Amino acid sequence: MLRTFTRHLFVIAVLFTLAGTALSADPGIELPNDISVRGVSQSSDQKKGSVLIFNIYNSSPINANNENTRINITNANGLTDAFIHLFFIDGNTCNVADAFLCLTANQTASFLTSDLDPGITGYIVAVATNENGIPISFDYLMGDEYVKIFTGHFANLGALAISTATDQLNVTSVNEGISAALLFDGINYQRLPHVLAINNIPARADGNDTMVVLNRIGGDYSIGASKIGSFFGLLYDDAESVVSYSFSTNVCQYRASISNAFPRTTPRLDTIIPSGRSGWTKLWPTGTADNRPFGGAADLISLTGVVLNKNSNMKSSSNAFSGGRNMHHMTLTPLAVIVIPVFPASC
């Protein structure tokens, strides 16, 4: 009896060991559990920060009523004004346009992207600076957005906030002060995500159209944002069976509806997730970023993303829903770098 019990304990111990190995298999740095220490808590759409990422924006130059985005940004500091350098990244060309937004203490502001950058789809990075355009530690910015797409997808998404890990922010001067490098290394700014997850993918056969939006975060914004490159992913059904997939893209924002064509799996998606069933996926870029000029190495690429679901039966079925959310962050990159131009705020 004792021998049988001991054998059972050994089997359980082996299973826990294997489970721990599987959990640590994702590339990148594990997200920390202790969020009580400043600099440990990572990017989130439920907090304030010195950098905000709005994961998608769009607008139609012809019919802004049908396709548009409203950006909302708030300065939660009750004493100090905020200078915010906005960077609008074209998801297809990776070209960058910019503007300054200045907020007084406790002020909030909203604008339509059809007024500032009509006809472009991409993402926005907002950086807190001083009046001279130099990045500073100012963990009081928060934001959200309302987005509607001509396909019928819509969502209210919180802006991802990245706070600084220290009040003494070390801003690396580039090109003799013409530009500044933002280091997301857990020492200056908090780290950015590497492995992303979509925790629920409903069946297409039930009227669901799930759109995926992926953003490469990094690059020299005086030249252009970095491109995504190659991906690898794992797709699970609700019975824990798994298949892998891969794909490549030459843009800095990738947008596609989950279907039998994307991601290409064997068997196809509709077989893996049939009517009445669901699944989930995690994915990550397989390339590297050369961060050696900033004290790094060939580091993992940083990624953020959004998932938007549209169900054509929403008004006729109790189990049909539409909306969107930011993707879950599974692991982090050791270092990500954004280089921004530096010049005085124009407001």
Give the positions of each predicted feature.
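Generic low-polarity alpha-helical segments
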Residues: 1, 18-19, 212, 281
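Bacterial N-terminal signal peptides that target proteins for export
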Residues: 2-10
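Gly/Pro-rich, tryptophan- and cysteine-flecked surface segments typical
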Residues: 24-347
